[in-house]
Amino acid sequence: MKGRRALEALNFFVADVQAGIGPFLGVFLQARGWGADQIGTVMTIGGIAGMLATSPAGALVDATRHKRSLVVIAGLMTMLASGLLWISHGYWMVAASQVATAITGAAIGPALAGMTLGMVRQHGFDRQFGRNQVANHGGNVVAAALSGWLGWRYGFGAVFVLSALFGLLSIVAVSSIPADAIDHDVARGADAKATAGEPAAAGAPASGLRVLLQSRPLLLLAAALGLFHLGNAAMLPLYGLAIVAAHQGEPSAFTAQTIVIAQLVMVAAAMLATRLIRWRGYWWVILLTFLALPVRGLIAASVIHAWGVWPVQALDGIGAGLQSVAVPALVVRLLEGSGRVNVGQGVVMTVQAAGAALSPALGGILAHRFGYPAAFIALGAVSTGSLVLWLSFGATLRHACAADGGAARNAVEAASPAS
């Protein structure tokens, strides 16, 4: 029980570590004379670096028995990268900071998922990961609210200090998790039938990486999420830039407001996600997230005003909150028994990161040339590709996403060649 509470505390504090000053980066650079296109491209550079690092990071999490140390190193590197950003505002120094933040952040997601699976096993993963995400979104709310107030009261420097403080607290939290609380074979999904009282077979062999390519539902999930994030990732920073450019809000305070609203909704969505999955299954829950984004784009284009942040970010919170629980849990179920669960998490995150990396450049260029409303409409239109894909392969995906997971697991096992 102590280990689980420490795990939830880690998820709370690591929320601000994963992205560094991420959401505040746009207004921070805008205040120093950067244009929307420059901001978009430098964020894309970081996104591409994170995309390239995510799959290797997942493989590393599967292979290592030092997952706690991996989180500590990632936290330290993120703090150093944020310090570099504060010291220098030159294009390539900022780009280097974003690359470092993205690479280290890429390791944290699979590491947290693997640690959770290793501690509570398959039968307890959905519930515990839901609790983790509630803590994570709660951490984002607190960090954003404090960052907004500190930035307004003391300037952007205080935002960097707060990020470093959260980094130190995340190190304390991960150090509080007992080393023997994590079964590293179970953590990579090597024991499909593990229960709370049955240890995994030591050194259980992992099936080949081809299982990832031969799991059609996994590839469809990744492709749909890639299209979703191509439209989604740029909306928050662009909406903040649009409001600030229209002189509708103070940069730090408004950026914090956008984050707090979304994260509060994410807390509620994450709390409901496990119940919705049990009631309707993964397919319907993920479909709901895809439906929310085009509507969000239309509202963002129509209401560039301070009060518009409420519907725009509430819809973001619904989509992100449900996905934060449903997607990792579905990947665990699809690859149960393969021994490559965290590689699978990394593959899905890589495709998501590809869409997210291209989104700021696409949105920034469109906003620079055609204005913010056109950019929001275009991003919302792009995201409908995820909806089309999810519906077109509905029969296959509904079968694989069934809440009992049996069909999906059998499909993966049938596709798994001997290593």
Regions found by a protein language model. Give the residues of each.
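Loop-to-transmembrane helix entry
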Residues: 35-45, 247-264, 343-346
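Symmetry-related core transmembrane helices of the 12-TM Major Facilitator Superfamily/SLC fold
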Residues: 158-175, 376-392
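Juxtamembrane intracellular "pre-TM" segments in multi-pass secondary transporters
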Residues: 1, 180-221, 411-415
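Structural signature of the two symmetry-related core transmembrane helices
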Residues: 69-83, 164, 284-298
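Helix-to-loop junctions at the C-terminal end of transmembrane segments
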Residues: 53-66, 151, 269-281
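Cytoplasmic helix-loop-helix junction between adjacent transmembrane helices
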Residues: 99-136
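Helix-loop boundary and gating motifs at the non-cytosolic
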Residues: 1-47, 219-220, 224, 229-244, ...
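A late C-terminal transmembrane helix in Major Facilitator Superfamily
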Residues: 340-368
